[in-house]
């Protein structure tokens, strides 16, 4: 049976893990790292770079490098490169394709099944878009799992049968979640979840960037925000400074040649940022995590003292101010240090993949829907059918009626959120139920059913009880992609995968050819050098000329893009090189009798096996 992987598709970094002998293993990528930057770049030569290579060239290719696309998932955002528009799903799919490739390389087999994690507070459109990204990448998405739930699964599975309450505080690169879970006897149950989809480490980086821009403007009068390349360098320096301030009290930010003044003189940026100053300029961001924490405690109906363990997830939780705040909020409870905040979510996803594949037994994962779901009723009111923090999968029905006499149809508008007025919430989609027989208002019976599957994706049905007519919608308008568009993107991704394979093959062939040309040229030059030194070449000039011709053909082929021509030229050069080697060997053999006759009897040409010993050392040993 083919194995399934667990993928943490993060804002700044992504991780893939797989079960090996029942234990989760984080897979290192082709660059040797266990985390892959969620960065995609379109090089000007047509190559698509993903991960660290994409991040490395960001400064010189700002407009064609995309990062933190997770913040746009589930929206109508797109980016145009070379007259082609790319959606967040397509960019995310590039990252997933790399993770898939790296996992396949590690396992030595094809991977099609995956469990992908999302922030607990992701709405339906964002979940649907994440699933579509998986499909575009050629993955069969077995399940969409909430990140804190996956983390709790990874943390709590081996904690015995005693029931425990775990708080997961998840601050990633672009999103924040806090969840309360109960674990015991193989059951992982989410009690409550809350969060902010637009709060993460990127926001802390942005504050440092703003601070640096203001400092530089104050000293030089130049506004760096107008220089894209300078801003990219500032972002990279800000991320590095943030990381350094987690272990140091201050850090030096030094960027030579950041820009030039009016007289074209180069200017340097050199600033010292202390941890205290960093915490001051980001205090309001930290404070935004308090309300979701308090909401979760309230929704779960427990007190802070009931929490047994605190698990920190996401690289941003390494900031000392975050750790201190969590300790303060939990009444001094020390966060668990036994999990890697960057990897624990992928590990949990791999375990859930194992559960779905039957590799992990006796584990039940009970997740919740993070936001209430309902429809708009008379007066623009949001009538909730499913309350937030309801365990999923779930199904709820409610009967409604018409607002006007002889109303022939009803418009069902589906919303997600907590506001009392429907329009203040997120509109997921709408559809119409037609063919209602003429009747006074209040008489027709319209049954509306909400069905949320285990991925947290919503299906809504409206049925006229009188006629039996019904209409169903699978909410996907929020993602903005039709089945045809997804199919097109899948084909596009497959085509690019083939392009990438060809490009890698082309690079390998080109490198081999260049290496062969260099080595052969060097060898021919040595032979001619020996002849000019008076020793005489052991090879006829005619043979060397043939090699020269083959080298020239190979060089000419390398100037073009025809790989078959390069291969053909390389084969020809290989044949001539072998002929050259054979000629040298034969010439050397021919010289042997003459060279050996000075040394005595013909019988002396027996070969003796012996070690070479240094003469002086030999004398000392005698």
Swiss-Prot record:
<dbReference type="InterPro" id="IPR043129">
    <property type="entry name" value="ATPase_NBD"/>
</dbReference>
<feature type="modified residue" description="Phosphothreonine; by autocatalysis">
    <location>
        <position position="175"/>
    </location>
</feature>
<dbReference type="InterPro" id="IPR013126">
    <property type="entry name" value="Hsp_70_fam"/>
</dbReference>
<protein>
    <recommendedName>
        <fullName>Chaperone protein DnaK</fullName>
    </recommendedName>
</protein>
<dbReference type="InterPro" id="IPR012725">
    <property type="entry name" value="Chaperone_DnaK"/>
</dbReference>
<dbReference type="InterPro" id="IPR029048">
    <property type="entry name" value="HSP70_C_sf"/>
</dbReference>
<dbReference type="GO" id="GO:0005524">
    <property type="term" value="F:ATP binding"/>
</dbReference>
<comment type="similarity">
    <text>Belongs to the heat shock protein 70 family.</text>
</comment>
<dbReference type="GO" id="GO:0051082">
    <property type="term" value="F:unfolded protein binding"/>
</dbReference>
<keyword id="KW-0597">Phosphoprotein</keyword>
<feature type="region of interest" description="Disordered">
    <location>
        <begin position="584"/>
        <end position="622"/>
    </location>
</feature>
<keyword id="KW-0067">ATP-binding</keyword>
<dbReference type="InterPro" id="IPR029047">
    <property type="entry name" value="HSP70_peptide-bd_sf"/>
</dbReference>
<keyword id="KW-0143">Chaperone</keyword>
<feature type="compositionally biased region" description="Acidic residues">
    <location>
        <begin position="606"/>
        <end position="615"/>
    </location>
</feature>
<comment type="function">
    <text>Acts as a chaperone.</text>
</comment>
<keyword id="KW-0547">Nucleotide-binding</keyword>
<dbReference type="GO" id="GO:0072659">
    <property type="term" value="P:protein localization to plasma membrane"/>
</dbReference>
<dbReference type="InterPro" id="IPR018181">
    <property type="entry name" value="Heat_shock_70_CS"/>
</dbReference>
<dbReference type="Pfam" id="PF00012">
    <property type="entry name" value="HSP70"/>
</dbReference>
<dbReference type="GO" id="GO:0140662">
    <property type="term" value="F:ATP-dependent protein folding chaperone"/>
</dbReference>
<keyword id="KW-0346">Stress response</keyword>
